[in-house]
Every structure is written in structure tokens, then in C-alpha cells.
Amino acid sequence: MKIEIIKKNINFGGIVSDINITEDLNGDIINNLDNKLNELCLLVFKKQKLTDNQQIKFSEYFGKIEGAGNNTTIRSMKERRLSDKFGDVSNLDVNNKPLKKTDNKRFFALGNRLWHTDASFKKIPAKYSLLSGRKVAKIGGETQFVDMRAAYDALSEEKKSIIKNMISYHSLIYSRQKLGLDMKKMISAEEIKNFTPVKQPLVRENKITKRKALFLASHIGKIEGMEKPDAILFVNDLIEHSTQENFLYTHHWDEDDLVIWDNRQSMHRGLYFNDQNEIRDVRRTTTVSYTHLRAHETREDLVCRLLLE
């Protein structure tokens, strides 16, 4: 296995070669990949023709899969193409046809083109996301990633002091409001409860590397102790700072690419493609780490590892 660093100036991202992730992998390889994710935050695997079951198996090497629950989508179970272990970030309906231009599910999915961190709106947010390009757009549809560790490091000491104990509120309602969507008209009052805002720190520290990172997303709608307009502008300024070119990697998709990234240390967004005339079938699995026993790991090993994560 070889890893070529993508952005050497900030030690961000790596292209992994000489590995077939459709096969069984031993504990040493998984631990090496996990260590590289802590170090580089993002790994790209080329030419990995995965089935859904193979993607699930590979994902579970890194933690328990967080299912696509009612607080992640407005698609009902009967409207979903994929199992609930997947986040469907395609432009397709249950019949594998492009969602119509005026479909609320399409409008909701457009929120993925805003800068965000997966599942920051959950009490226990995501650790890793794994995105498999089953069919990709010929033009557009890239995914951009930014290194939130480097963005934090570049802040002034004064700004670091200001934000170190800040608490923000995350909800998909906040990000969709930025698109002009009125969720109260799209779903029922009972369903709205699934999107109750949750608190998150504005700065997180990786317990292994000890590096701090900004924890931002367009899902933020409030900051404790700030008036809402001030909070929105404050977050917008931080996002603008964090998405400078020197912190950014743009992934141009080839079919059968698999990209895995650390949501604790990065932020991302999808770019425009013609979703009425092209199919973009990308399937995401998302992991959390608090209940998973890795291959060749004892329960005592698990407890020790989780104390570090």
C-alpha cells in the first residue's frame, strides 16, 4: 500500500494505491489507514468497484455505521432507493430517475452544495464519511474539501481565544433556510421535531494528534451568547476564512472512486452539475466509533481506544 500526499504544504489528503478494498483487510492495514486519516484527514481510493455490501463491510472496519434516520432526510422509507445504512446523495428517485426540478426532495438535497460537516446536527456527530462514486457526472459534480485544522492554525491568537469555548447550534433546518426553503411547508409539525437543533463546540481537538480544528457547517443557526444576526455573520466569516484556496482540495470524480474523510477535522461541499440531464449516483456511509470492535481487537483494546478518541 502506498499513499501520495495531495496537499503537502498543509499535510492534507492522500491518494492510496496498491490496495483492493473489496477484499478482506487485516487489522494492521486498517490501523494504518486509520492512523493516516488522523494525520491526513482525507483518503482517495481509485478504481474500487464496490457493491453495497462491500462498502458496508469496508466502512465497518472504522466504526459502527450511522443509519440514515429521520433527522437526515425528508425521504420516507418507501421513497428510499438504498438501505438505511446509506445516505443517498444522488439526484435519483426510487425508480432511479432524476428527481424532478420542483421536487422538495431535490430542493432539500441542494443543501449539500453548502459548506457542511456530515451529521453535525446529531448529538453524536459523524466521525468518518465514505463516498462511493457508482456513476458520476461528465461535467461538474466535484466535491471540495477543506482542512479545518489548517484553518484553525491560521487564525490569530486573539480569534482563537475568542472562539475556544463557543457553543453553536446545528440543524438541517438552518442550512435549508439559507436556500429559502420553508421546512414547515415541506414536512409535518411532528416531523419538524426530528430536526431539533443540537449543541456542538466551535473548536474540537483530535485526542490522538492533539491538533485543534474549527467545527463549522452551514447547519449552524445560533451561537450561545450572541444575537442571531451576529452569530450568522460570525460563522459566515469563519467559513469564508476556512475555504481559502490554500486549505482546499477539489476532488474530480472518476467512476468507482471511494473517498473517505474525517468530519471532525474537515468541511466539504458538492459542486453544480446538470441534475436534470445527468445521473450522479454517489452513495455515502457514515461511521461513529463508540460501539465498534475492530477486527483482531479485544474489548479491553476497544475501551482503551475509545478513551483516546
Range-by-range predicted roles:
Residues 2-258, 263-290:
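Non-heme Fe(II) oxygenase catalytic core, chiefly the N-lobe of the double-stranded beta-helix
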Residues 291-300:
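Conserved small/polar residues in nucleotide/adenosyl-binding loops
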Residues 302-309:
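Hydrophobic alpha-helical segments, chiefly the membrane-spanning helices
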